[in-house]
Amino acid sequence: MGKTAVFNEERIKLPDFLIGESKVRKYVLDASVVFKWYYKKNEVDLCKADILYNFLDSKEYLLFAPDLLIYEILNAFRLKEEIKNEIIDSIVSELYDAIFIIETDKGILRDAFVHARTLNISFYDGIYIALSKKLDAPLITADKKLYRLGKDLPHRIIMLSDFSEK
């Protein structure tokens, strides 16, 4: 079936030029970064997260995340009772409209497991690394442990605090 993504709540086939040969900058984001877009209380590096949020309206950047991101964001908000259900609905809609949400396939799952076992990280974190590798796009994270354990991988992992759009 080739490379596909869910965008605007519809499955689309991603043309190879969009993934491989585009001059557009591509990034994979994990939930630790995206969460900061919607919840500011006791969070750090909000300015850097806001830069990435502003990329949503840019034609120069493509932001990707595995479908796992939606589950992690919803789970993080589960205990934030001050965030009303209507707000959660709009967050989910915005994420599907603005980020290319990539369905995890067998290849990503297999690669994620290898990374999880090799780096001693969660399988969930391994999914972000595997997607980053598959798309040949840097992974941006605010997770210090993930960064520390994955920074020496051949594909780039960028700590949010170190992110620069240059």
How would you label these PLM feature ranges?
Residues 71, 108-109, 162-166:
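A short acidic, often aromatic-flanked loop/helix-cap motif at beta-alpha or helix-coil junctions
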Residues 1-65, 80-87, 166:
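Short, well-structured N-terminal submotif of metal-dependent ribonuclease cores
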Residues 33-34, 69, 108, 128, ...:
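Alpha-helix capping/helix-boundary segments
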